[in-house]
């Protein structure tokens, strides 16, 4: 397993959710879809909501299928882990010998606790070069990108449509994922 993306996959069209999970999945697939099956990494998508619900679970799988169904070739496996984990469970996941790195394309509006926790493993972190995580991701790959207006599908009472979010350079992110996988 090359990477973990820890976060919420909530409001916002593809590529416009707070954590940019859809674009992370698509970039991962584009990066490794032509890799031989025996050498192809997998993606672990760790999500959590307020509580577990079948509706949320089905929504996550629908979002993934909306991305994966357009590919007519074999693609890397995507494993979904849903729910709240204890500190020990997250530690075991982060430190699992098959987990090689964490990837986060978050648009950046906070500290990035999962990124801070993952740093303790001393494994690579590939993350947006924006927001609170810049303070502690000193030995990680900070992805370049640009500021763009928040997409109307993500705007709500907390995220104003006049706001701007950071969008990573997906081509550069793909190159870095390949380098980390080698």
Model-derived features with residue positions:
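C-terminal "capping" alpha-helix adjacent to the active site of nucleotide-linked donor transferases
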Residues: 147-182
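Short catalytic/ligand-binding loop motif for oxyanion handling, primarily in non-cytosolic enzymes
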Residues: 10-15, 51-55, 111-112, 133-136, ...
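Short hydrophobic beta-strand element within catalytic cores of glycosyltransferases
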Residues: 124-127, 141-144
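Conserved catalytic-core segment of nucleotide-activated headgroup transferases in glycan assembly
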Residues: 1-89
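Nucleotide-sugar-dependent
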Residues: 15, 105-112, 134-135, 156-164
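Short glycine/proline-rich turn/loop motifs
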Residues: 5-12, 99, 153-162
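Short alpha-helical segment that forms part of, or immediately flanks, the ligand-binding pocket
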Residues: 91, 116-123, 131-135
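Acidic donor-binding loop of glycosyltransferase active sites
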Residues: 92-110, 120-123
């Amino acid at each position: 397993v090359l990477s973990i993306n820890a976060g919420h996959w909530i409001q916002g069209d593809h590529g416009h959710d707070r954590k940019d999970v859809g674009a992370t999945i698509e970039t991962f697939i584009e990066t490794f879809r032509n890799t031989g099956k025996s050498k192809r990494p997998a993606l672990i998508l760790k999500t959590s909501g307020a509580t577990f619900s079948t509706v949320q679970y089905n929504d996550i799988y629908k979002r993934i299928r909306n991305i994966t169904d357009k590919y007519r070739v074999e693609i890397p496996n995507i494993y979904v882990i849903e729910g709240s984990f204890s500190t020990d469970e997250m530690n075991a996941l982060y430190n699992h010998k098959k987990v090689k790195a964490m990837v986060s394309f978050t648009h950046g509006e906070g500290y990035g606790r999962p990124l801070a926790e993952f740093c303790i493993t001393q494994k690579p972190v590939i993350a947006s070069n924006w927001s609170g995580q810049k303070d502690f991701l000193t030995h990680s790959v900070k992805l370049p990108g640009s500021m763009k207006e928040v997409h109307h599908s993500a705007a709500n009472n907390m995220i104003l449509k006049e706001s701007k979010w950071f969008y990573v350079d997906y081509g550069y992110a793909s190159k870095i994922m390949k380098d980390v996988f080698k």
